Amino acid sequence: CTILWHVDDLKISLVDETVLEKIARKLDKKYGTKDAPLTVNRGSVHEYLGMTIDYTTKGAVQFRMTDFIDGLLEEAAEDMRGTANSPAYHHLFKVNPNAKRLDEKKADYFHHMTAKLLYLCKRTRADIMTAVAFLTTRVSAPDEDDYKKLARCIKYLRATKDLTLTLEFNDSGTLEWWVDAAFAVHKDMKSHTGAVLTMGKGGVFAISRKQKINTTSSTTAELVGVSDALPLVIWTRKFLEAQGFKVTDNIVYQDNQSAMLLEQNGKRSSGKNTRHLDIRYFYCTDQINGDEKTMSVHYCPTGEMLGDFMTKPLQGSQFKKFRALILNIKPDQPATSPKSDRPEECVETRTV
């Protein structure tokens, strides 16, 4: 039995429906009252934490947050009207030192909207995650240039508000992580880590974040990127195995072969340009070569590297190609996607 628990909102799933009913009755007996019984929803379509989760299609689950996006767009300022083909300009990471700082009211609005975008991208819209990752680094002192980048992301959402995330799992038992890093792209010359997890079709999880330390080469940036993702790489395998899922391989794909050698061989492949690295970044060597062998590292050409989507503001056909793979949609799919024709099945609803 799997229970997702967020404050007082629970999502429970199990093959045996009788056990689900038993759990619901016990929870109602423990926490429900005559005047305020628990609310129970059953069926193929559920509303949970602002998401619509649709299990209508066999072998797939679709996530959408159209209502959340509609509310966000209603809050958009007048100068954020219009649409855009991508969530970020190609110069996303460039900071203009001469740009005027936003006044307090506008800065608060910038922070508010960025927080909403962060909530959205971490649940269903990973296609805006790179843009949002940069915006979150600017909330403490945003300027007019940052505001324009926020507006660009809002305009893209307006053009694509009905896009959904659909996950389809295969039976290979293979977890595939696509990990990449963009070297020294931030104002302080720090690099940017990107990662995507797939278990069939669609991105189950994604990372796009500024690295916490400076590195001296693209190789060391890639190594730090893997270190950033490694806790999740290991935890995901252990979590799935605890759920009874047989994991046959836990693959980390990279496009930097020098970094791969360091990860596979540890200090034996370390030259004068990498000796300064803390030993913790070779923890992955133990995961690859140790007794448990919790992961393996494979090469992936840059043109096929999904993690690249999370490290830089891609444009045009490459952006659409990776977006389609991560959201599991067609590359030429229109921005307005039809919702499920099947109405929500709700066997029982009790209001608090």
Cite the ranges covered by each PLM segment.
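Structured nucleic-acid-interacting core domains from mobile-element enzymes and related host factors
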Residues: K155-A181, F245-K246
